[in-house]
Amino acid sequence: MMNEFELINHYFNWPLSDPSIELGVGDDAALFEIDADCQIVTSTDTLSEGVHFFKDVLPGDIAYKSLAVNLSDIAAMGAKAKYFTLSLTLPKLDEIWLQEFSESLKEASEFFKVSLIGGDTTKGPLNITITIMGVVQKSKAIKRSGAKNGDHIYVSGDLGDAALCLKKMNEGIKPNSSVLNKLNKPVPRIKLGPALINIASACIDVSDGLEQDLTHILRASKVGAILDSESLPLSDSVQDYLKTSQDLGLPLCGGDDYELCFTSDQSHQAEIKKLSESLNIRITKIGVINNSQTLEIRGYEGSSKSYQHF
């Protein structure tokens, strides 16, 4: 049986293609260089079995999502991801599971052009923790605190598919492949995020639900907003669900969307439309910022059902 160091070397010591990395996996710490006019942006997310994914989810899907959700955080800051570390807690040494996990993670890292530079392994309940690092030009990072009165509120993509998938699975109903992919293989908006620099006044990735995540922007910016529930971008699957359930709480509060919600001055409407077309990403105006210090959701009477970690 492999020991910890053999496991790391066999499954995760991949060839490095980024010349900025001097030391990666295998030393006490990583060593890399960044340009003098850049700032480092870093974020950490943990995915736990039974909380963030079901026990029967494929190891390749777990690997992909673990990286994708971290990339989404970096994109929300307008940064470009460069490096990541992996901390893997395993209940047992399952070489077939590890092989599938490693291959998928390597494939995803190559696709998104981000390099694994270190990490750790230990024994325990299945947990995957990734810390990701990106770079952004100094003073250009998009924060949550920049929204201004009169700004328009936008969101990328569609909302509610991942939540619908979870709902169906919890009810013992097999979801269609479209919503299942939205849950297991979210697409981080790594091109949209950096493109929003000088356009977005504030930005956040929608991980815990639009209502809750937009509220983070409002609190950080000390503003309020009016959100139009009829403007929410919804897939055919979610629209079909709403026809019978009228459950607007699902797309508003469901979470796991990993889309970008951002605010922008009205003068940027034409630029945002061009971005949507050039990146082939649906970008929808869903509301307006005001000075009320509250969030009013027109057409929705329900209470918050956004994801709570505790």
What does each of the following model-derived ranges do?
Residues 1-58, 77, 82, 86:
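Extreme N-terminal cap/leader segments of soluble proteins
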Residues 2-13, 91-115, 122, 126, ...:
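Glycine-/charge-enriched secondary-structure boundary and capping motifs
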Residues 24, 41-43, 115-119, 154-157, ...:
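General beta-strand structural signal in soluble alpha/beta enzymes
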Residues 31, 70, 78, 116, ...:
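Residue-level signal for inorganic ion chemistry
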Residues 34, 40, 47, 80-168, ...:
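Glycine-rich anion-binding loops of enzyme active sites
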Residues 59-83, 100-111, 189-191, 195, ...:
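Small-aliphatic-rich amphipathic alpha-helix that forms the alpha element of a beta-alpha
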Residues 148, 153-157, 186-210:
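Internal active-site segments that recognize and position negatively charged phosphoryl groups
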Residues 165, 171-187:
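A short, charged helix-loop
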